[in-house]
Amino acid sequence: MNKLIRRAVTIFAVTSVASLFASGVLETSMAESLSTNVISLADTKAKDNTSHKSKKARKNHSKETPVDRKEVAPVHESKATGPKQDSCFGRMYTVKVNDDRNVEITQAVPEYATVGSPYPIEITATGKRDCVDVIITQQLPCEAEFVRSDPATTPTADGKLVWKIDRLGQGEKSKITVWVKPLKEGCCFTAATVCACPEIRSVTKCGQPAICVKQEGPENACLRCPVVYKINVVNQGTATARNVVVENPVPDGYAHSSGQRVLTFTLGDMQPGEHRTITVEFCPLKRGCATNIATVSYCGGHKNTASVTTVINEPCVQVSIAGADWSYVCKPVEYVISVSNPGDLVLRDVVVEDTLSPGVTVLEAAGAQISCNKVVWTVKELNPGESLQYKVLVRAQTPGQFTNNVVVKSCSDCGTCTSCAEATTYWKGVAATHMCVVDTCDPVCVGENTVYRICVTNRGSAEDTNVSLMLKFSKELQPVSFSGPTKGTITGNTVVFDSLPRLGSKETVEFSVTLKAVSAGDARGEAILSSDTLTVPVSDTENTHIY
């Protein structure tokens, strides 16, 4: 009887796995790798301990070959409904299907049961991930009668029990117990399947940005003196403010160095609590009151504004500088700096600072303190309507565009006054292209070769362009080949090279012509060089003795 039960349990386990495969829960490769491990039957205490026949039967049973086991999954003895002394069914054993997908399902049934006495079937579903709409289907044994289930359900026409779980979280377990009553002897086969939809949850954090703007600026300022405003922007909300933009129209009577009438500052995204500061500087052009208004806007929010009103007083100081627009390198250039007080206030502690670009050398600046490329004049007082003039003599060592910046600072009852000016001079270099011609073999025998080498060098401070070279040889020499930075052409006893587009300052290029001595005599080779800088072509002659 025990052997029969062992075989029945093994068939049941395989049938359960097959049912899972047929329901689509298991893939073929997974089903092939599954195995069933059945807990051996617990020894049941014989009712007649004195029966020798029973002992012999158990002894013979222990010598039988173990049932061929196809291990599918770990087998666990159920602790929920273990065998009791007065129960009509054996210990529970569990068949577990390992599935790393959505839901893991196990089924526990007794090793044996008694006809006419109910026995339990325990189904446990474990969430491998968050799932919804979990449907568990239990196929009732054919030769058994449904008694009850927990949770309660009603069998379908084809003998199936169906439970629906709205949601099964990851790691969460759901247990179902079904009681059935076997109607006749034999094996009661049962199978359970599960279907589930994986659940994905997303979280969107909602908040409200709140952009505030404040502005700081002077109450009084002087005409033509810089007026600086600080615009402070802060996000006092709970969410990120997107695409924050600050617009600051230039007030009437003000000018900005960019020449624009509306200044726009793109701050991008601002996190909660983030603070930004913008500094704007204007130059007042007329007296009176001027109000600077800054407006901040952001995506989906209201615009906020902040304003500061400044009273503009009389002008304080003016400065200008004049000099040559262009000059040649190493040629002195004089700049004239003019400082004046067009207002009605006395200027005190006037400082005139002239800063020259690197590469420019100060040659002379009367009454000034010279330090490297900086020249400074100081004046104790500059009365209204009074003007001062300073001269500085400079020279550039290299070609290029250099700017001379002048800043005047002073104090008055109106406060600190500053004015600035600049002058730019373009310093040009001068190209100086030279040529040198030599022959490598002299004298040479008739039939031998010699090479004429022509070196072209730009010794000047500027590049030369369209540099062309032509060579003419007497009848004693016959050009054979040539080389150089450009292509050439041999026509009779003349070699012409294509123009070189550019010859940089201090750059040298070399041309060479290989010649064959064809007759004895005092041969001559003439090189003619021309370029955009050379108004008249330059020629050089080399002689070669042929014997």
From Swiss-Prot:
One of its GO terms (cellular component) is periplasmic space. In elementary bodies (EBs, the infectious stage, which is able to survive outside the host cell) provides the structural integrity of the outer envelope through disulfide cross-links with the small cysteine-rich protein and the major outer membrane porin. It has been described in publications as the Sarkosyl-insoluble COMC (Chlamydia outer membrane complex), and serves as the functional equivalent of peptidoglycan. It is present but the disulfide bonds are reduced in reticulate bodies (RBs). Residues 52-61 have a biased composition (Basic residues). This is Large cysteine-rich periplasmic protein OmcB, serovars I/J. The gene is omcB. Residues 45-84 are annotated as: Disordered. GO terms for molecular function: extracellular matrix structural constituent. It is found in: Periplasm. Residues 23-40 form a propeptide. It comes from the Bacteria. Its main location: periplasm. InterPro entries: Chlam_OMP6, Chlamydia_OmcB, DUF11_rpt, Ig-like_fold, OmcB-like_DUF11. Residues 62-79 have a biased composition (Basic and acidic residues). Keywords: Cell shape, Disulfide bond, Periplasm, Signal. GO terms for biological process: regulation of cell shape. Residues 1-22 form the signal peptide. Coiled coil: none annotated. Part of a disulfide cross-linked outer membrane complex (COMC) composed of the major outer membrane porin (MOMP), the small cysteine-rich protein (OmcA) and the large cysteine-rich periplasmic protein (OmcB). PANTHER family: LARGE CYSTEINE-RICH PERIPLASMIC PROTEIN OMCB (PTHR34819:SF4). The lineage of its organism: Bacteria, Pseudomonadati, Chlamydiota, Chlamydiia, Chlamydiales.
